[in-house]
Regions:
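C-terminal motif of bacterial Sec signal peptides marking the signal peptidase cleavage site
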Residues: 13-18
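N-terminal export and membrane-targeting signals
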Residues: 1-11
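A residue-level marker of the well-folded mature domains of exported/periplasmic proteins
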Residues: 19-393
């Protein structure tokens, strides 16, 4: 009965949730490295302390099983979960921002396989796809509060807009696990993700700026605004580019569309003649960017992608000057593991920071796999799961 009354209150709160999707705006940060320069003002998402902490984690040693990075933790801070302990088997519910790109599709297959691997411990797994729409996800969470879930996993579509919905779930008495993208509240039992956007953005931007000729022209390609992990990737890249005095001639949103990406790159080639570097806040359309240079008869400049196999193959075949910071899809296993530990009353880390490996020229060969589809991600952490490799093909 307590959960039912709390859920009713939560529904009322959800009805008051704002309708706007997050939009990044410039804002003061109080930090010298956040000041505007050639790349404009820093994003409202930039937090100097978080930036410093993530860069420090790049050199940290994780705790946990050496062969299971999805169970490892960087600098763990354990929290008590005894109040959520209950007997199983359990009903675990998942409110998913979207399945609208290969990264999320590979990740969700990995999560489904983890559910299967847990066998009799999970009685029912409920997945709701918000289709990249804030208001649908708010309604989805509202609906799940009345479905008898034992734990709720949320990958929020955007940060600020989904925060009240997550807070409502917490107030309903559910143990909430947030992963991948964050929210502006501390109420979830744990927030799971790899090192994060600052680390990703920094690694790619440092490499590209160091490999470019001094004062060269750089094109930054972003997916969409308002998502914390993407905003912080750009925030960290901006710091690196400003420090290196890189001439950032454009910052464009691709919507994750290969055709739009190729058109943007071609437009900049036509406008400037030469582009000396390309930085991307995600690698899903990296091959499209490479192809735009090839189609124009231009050398491919230093570029960062991600661990998507099509990019790794092009990198190897064309001998690109490249790097692949990653946001590993193995993180999709961790929320299931965390939810079960919480329901067992075991302590978990909050935040639960996972390792975030980088693919370089030196280790590229170990991640290539010609037997898997081009849109598969090398960091899936899925080779020991039921249905591998067929489930991911």
């Amino acid at each position: 009965m307590r959960r039912s009354m709390a859920a009713l209150a939560a529904v009322t709160l959800l009805a008051l949730t704002a309708c706007a999707t997050d939009e990044p705006v410039a804002g003061p940060s109080g930090s010298a490295s956040a000041a505007g320069s050639g790349t404009g003002e820093q994003s409202k998402f930039f937090v100097q302390a978080d930036y410093d902490a993530e860069l420090a984690l790049l050199d940290a040693t994780p705790t946990g099983p050496a062969d299971k990075p999805w169970e490892q933790v960087l600098n763990p801070t354990m929290v008590d979960t005894a109040t959520f302990k209950k007997s199983g088997p359990h009903k675990i519910c998942f409110s998913n921002a979207a399945l609208n790109n290969p990264w999320r599709q590979v990740g969700f297959k990995t999560m489904q396989a983890e559910v299967e691997a847990q066998g009799s411990r999970i009685e029912e797994f409920v997945h709701v796809d918000a289709e990249g729409k804030d208001q649908k996800q708010i309604a989805d969470i509202n609906d799940l509060l009345g479905k008898g879930c034992d734990a709720l996993i949320v990958s929020p579509n955007t940060t600020a807009t989904l925060t009240p919905a997550v807070e409502a779930a917490c107030k309903a008495g559910l143990p909430v696990v947030v992963f991948d993208r964050g929210v502006d509240t501390k109420c979830p039992v744990t927030f799971i993700n790899p090192i994060g956007g600052y680390g990703f953005g920094h690694v790619g931007a440092e490499f590209v700026s160091q490999k470019m000729k001094p004062g060269g022209k750089l094109l930054a390609l972003r997916i969409l605004p308002g998502v914390d992990v993407l905003e912080t990737r750009w925030s960290a890249a901006k710091v690196a580019f400003d420090k290196a005095k890189v001439d950032v001639v454009g910052v464009e949103f691709t919507d994750g569309d290969p055709a739009k990406t190729k058109k943007i790159v071609d437009d900049y080639i036509q406008r400037y003649g030469t582009i000396d570097g390309v930085w991307m806040d995600a690698g899903a359309v990296a091959v499209a960017a490479v192809e735009a240079f090839q189609d124009a008869g231009k050398p491919v400049p230093p570029i960062n992608g991600e661990d998507q196999l099509d990019f790794l193959k092009v990198w190897k075949d064309k001998n690109l000057t490249a790097i692949a910071p990653t946001y590993p899809t193995y993180q999709w296993r961790t929320p299931i593991i965390a939810a079960l530990r919480i329901l067992d009353g075991q302590q978990v880390s909050n935040p639960w920071k996972l390792p975030q490996p980088t693919i370089t020229q030196d280790n590229l060969d170990q991640y290539l796999d010609a037997s898997m589809p081009p849109l598969h991600y090398a960091m899936c952490g899925c080779t020991d799961l039921p249905g591998y490799p067929q489930r991911w093909k």
